[in-house]
Amino acid sequence: MGTLYEVLVPKFHLLEIDRTRRHVRCQTYTDSERMYGGPKDRTYGCEKGLGLDNLLLLTDSYKVTHFKQYPPGTKTICSYFESRGGRHVDINFFGLQYFLKRYLCGVVVTTEKIDEAQAIYTAHFPDALFPRDKWEYIVENHGGKLPVEICAVPEGLTLPYKNVLMTVENTDPECFWLTNYLETLLVQVWYPMTVASNSRVQKKVCFDALKATSDCDLTNPFSWMFMLNDLYV
């Protein structure tokens, strides 16, 4: 298993795996250093206003019931993420570090968030389907940190389709259900990956056209790097 690599943005720290307690963690960074944090007052009808900061709510609702559907005796779930294909010959892997540092690092499960999630999921389906005890286990035994290990290829790497880009695996046998609970959040990396992949191809088109039709000094990146107005972001 590899390590998680640092996104090439100033002041973002390398995300590491805590091998002693087997949690996802990262070095301390301030709110002002977060990218795309978004407004903090966005809520979804909850009195306490936790909204998008509540990891328990950042999943497809049907996944809340999956803990009941695994075979008895399941201890470990390891899932992988890949790009199955697209319009180009390869893909640029980019964006995972933001989601890890924004949503998964540090203490992300609290009694307050469990209460909020239970209220919402109880309104959605019978209370017995919400595994409150399993989330409380994470609070009591892991201090609210997620007992999962996430490994990935380096941010910014371009590679062919049908390669494993990241893996997710639980590190506590009692939390085998957590691996795929995180899928909904982690697959949001498709958007920055798509932007990065398309931009890379478009940038190459500009470069090749200049090389074939102009006498620009292409060793100077300023002669061509501003040609692409990328509006994806």
Locate the predicted segments by residue:
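Intrinsic disorder/low-complexity segments
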Residues: 11-13, 19, 24, 30, ...
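Buried, small/hydrophobic-residue-enriched core segments of structured protein domains
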Residues: 4, 8, 12, 46-75, ...
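Low-complexity, highly charged intrinsically disordered N-terminal segments
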Residues: 77-130
